[in-house]
Structures are given as structure tokens and as C-alpha cells.
Amino acid sequence: MPRYRSLAVAIVSAVGLGWAVAALAGSGQGGDHAGSGFGYHLVKTVALGAPNQWDYAVFSPTTRRLFIAHGNRLTVVSAGTGRVVGQVGPIPGGPHGIAFDPAANLGITDDGRLGQAVIFNLHTLKIVKRVKVQRGADAVTFDPVSRHAFVIDGDTGEIAVVDPVRGTVVTFIHIGGDLEYAVPGNNGELYVNGVTHREIFRINTATNRVDATWPIPQCRSPHGLSIDTRTHRLFSSCENARLVVVDSLNGAVVTTLPIGRGTDSDRFDPKTGLIFSSNGLDGTLSIIHEVDANEFVAEPAVKTAISGRTMGIDRQSGRVFVVAAHTTRQTMDRFMAQRQKTHRWPHWSPFTPNSLRLLILDPGR
């Protein structure tokens, strides 16, 4: 995703400026939370504090902690208690993506402005190495087969391949165009969302070369990406409020399903067969049930909060985490009206100061 997109930027990129204001006018605050699909409901809200800048949220099964790209650090939250237990930082240029090498007890994030892969100890949270990569680094993912991290510059279409144990760059993969999230398969492949031409790239992680390019024309600006390795299905969430299901073996589009507006993350839970999309414009969590490889059912959405565009999931418990800052319809209307009038982004934030929070949702029991 672009660097620390505010809600307003996310809305404009998703639906266009004119539609954005109209959509906000009917959306309210997004402050009321109600459970629907599979009984998901809000159980806890955790204050994260200043600044109101955030990006990806990724759950570590090894430590049972959620890592959130937040300002100039990673904020670390216990998945069980919901308490903030530490930070990884400082990361002066701001982190975006997060990935883990659990066998080496390492985490990998990025400093986008300084162009660094930042490697840290998963348990002590101490930074152990900073590796020079490309400026504008954004999404980060880890391939368990090659044991390499992939640091994606979404704006230039370049991917740095990093060995986190050695703390070195292996190579750079140049794809070109705008890139978004990436997810590994089980057999040494990496799938990457291509925004510019609506496609998914498959990279062979042994050769670090693109060996397939698959069009997904139904998906305008693919953002989130997750995978069911058992059924060989990729799930790409799109800014035109669609989830596109793609065969990870041959790139065929299996189906498309409706989701909310303003998606920036999606996650798959293999335990339940549920696909989730966090939607910042609508302030909802879309839930889709994978019945089998070819049958998918869109379940009732669950209200979260306007701006809640990134998420994580604890696949052991089914607990879902959504990050959001508080804003109101009136504030966003004023913000967007000023943008329309001046054709520039206002120099003030549409969010209530120090209002960043983590919403924790559990399934029904």
C-alpha cells in the first residue's frame, strides 16, 4: 500500500473522489459494533495511542503476539490479553510490512524512507541487523522453503530478496509497475499482487524469477492476498469491492464475490475455511466461507470502524484484529471538501488525536 495512507487517500484510490464524499455522507462514525457472520463480535478495544499512522498488522503464532506497523516502530500486542507488551524500534522512516522466520526466532520489517530491511529478535524485540534494500520498501513476506524474506517496493515494482539469518541481500527481482501484498505457497512459490495491470505474478523462490503472470481483470487495484494451500486457491481483495478467487496452479479465475469498500488486507483461516477482508471505507469485516475449492458463500459482514483497513488473525483461536483511528462523518466531509476545492491534501488529519486503537473480535462459541 502507499506509504501510511490516511483514510482519505485510501478512499480516493478505492472509489474516486466524488463517490468518496457521497459514500462518507451515509457511513456515520463506524463506532457501533455488531456481530453477524459466524458470530464474530467485538470483545475488546485496545488503545494504541499516537501517532495515528499505521500499516500492516501481522500475527506471530510462535509468540502469540500481534505486530502492528505504527509510526516509527512496531507496536506489539499480546493476542491473549490484548495488552501492549513492547515495541520494535526505533524505525525512523516508518515500518510497513512484517514477516517472521520462526525457526531462526527472527522478525523482518522495513524502513521505507531509509530503504532498509530491519531484522529483529522475535522474543526480545531487539533489532539485530539493518540491511540496505530499496527506498520505498513496503510489504514484506517470508518464504519457508527458501528461508528468504521478500521486501516489496510497491511503487517501483522491485523486490529485494533478503536472507534474514545472514543479514544480506541475495538479489533483486524487478517486475515493474505498482505491486501490493504477496503470499508464499508450500512448494517454493511466491504470489504477488500486481496493481498496474490487474494481475498476479508467480515467482519461483529457488531461481528468484517470475515464471507466470496471470490476469485478474475483475479486480481493480488488488490489495490483500491470502492462500488456501490445500485447495490451491488464492484470494485477492480488490478496491472495487470484490474478492477474486484464483487457482494457484494455473491462474484461472474461479469466481468473484462481493466485499466491503476500502479493503487493504485479507486473511484466510484454514481451520474454519473463512476468508476475511478488512474494509476501511465501509468500516466492516467481510467474511466469506470456502465450502470447497469451487463453492464460496458470502456471509453477513461485521461492523468494525471507519478506517479499519488492515487486519491480522490468530488461526488457533479464530480471533481477528483490526486497526483503526477514530473519525466522524462530519470531519471526513470537511476534509474531502477541502481536498476537492484546493486539489491538494489538507495539512491536518481527519482523525481524533491519539485515537488509534486495536479492535479484537472473537467468533461465536
Per-region residue spans from a language model:
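Bacterial N-terminal signal peptides
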Residues: 9-22
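Predominantly soluble domains enriched in secretory-pathway, periplasmic, or organellar proteins
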Residues: 19, 24-365
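Bacterial N-terminal signal peptides that target proteins for export
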Residues: 1-11
